Amino acid sequence: VSMADKFIVESELASFKNESFECEMDSKKLRETAQEGGFFSYVAGVASYVIDHYRVKGLRIHIDEMDLPIKSGLSSSAAICVLVARAFNEMYELQLNTMGEMNIAFYGEQRTPSRCGRLDQACAFGVMPVNMTFDGNEVFVDKIKVKKPLYWVFSELNGSKDTVKILSDLNKCYPFAETEIEKNVQKALGIENEKLIAKATKAIESGDAEQVGSLMVEAQNMFDSMVAPASPKELAAPQLHKVL
């Protein structure tokens, strides 16, 4: 990362398909790119938010390594947003802590069509388990201390999903639930989720892998029965259930 007069993101990695992004440090132009969607919408959204709130010039960001697959439900969009927020923070000495970087990343991504929630920004803490609590617009983060190692397996299902459609369908359930499906979504993602997370936090802290696995099965069953009906086409997940 280096300072520049413009905002530039470049890479020789295959995921970039020999494309790079370059734009003047103009909030309007960057917002337009963000709103259009596309590969560089996330970095443009964050840069536009930074310009609107801080006295900064441009950056040249060269990405030479990427080990997180995109469009796989692993928060790749949040990761690139956090990267841009942290780059501005460190290069221009904005004196932001991790939560500050997360806020910039979140509001920057909100300027794109994806409009993902705050949970993904937890990647800002790196390889560290955290418990995130949401209360209205407030977010509280507590680090989880693990007594013994837990080993995780991540599998690439080679599937596809439309995140924008999923979020659009789920957002219809809020703020007022009118149908039984909408009530189930609010219950599952509200009080029932809170109970599961409390149990999971204790299991992770104690290093109880078997209990963690059992709770993951319970969470998946609840999701399938109470949340998936709100977006049946996108959340059917046939490949996932075949593997499970």
Features from the language model and the residues they span:
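DPxDG-like acidic metal-binding loop motif
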Residues: G73-N97
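A structural-propensity feature for long, helix-poor, extended segments
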Residues: Q110-Q121
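C-terminal nucleotide
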Residues: S2-A44, S48-R55, G108, C123-L244
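Alpha-helix capping and helix-loop boundary segments enriched in small/acidic/polar residues
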Residues: A34-G37, K71-S76, L96, P113, ...
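Glycine- and acidic-rich phosphate- and metal-coordinating loops
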Residues: A47-S48, D52-S72
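Short acidic, glycine/serine/threonine-rich loops at helix termini
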Residues: G73-S76, C116-R118, V127, K165-S168
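Phosphate-handling active-site elements
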Residues: D52-R60, F88-I104
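Acidic, glycine-rich active-site loops and adjacent beta-strand->loop/helix elements
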Residues: L13-S15, I63-I70, M102-T112
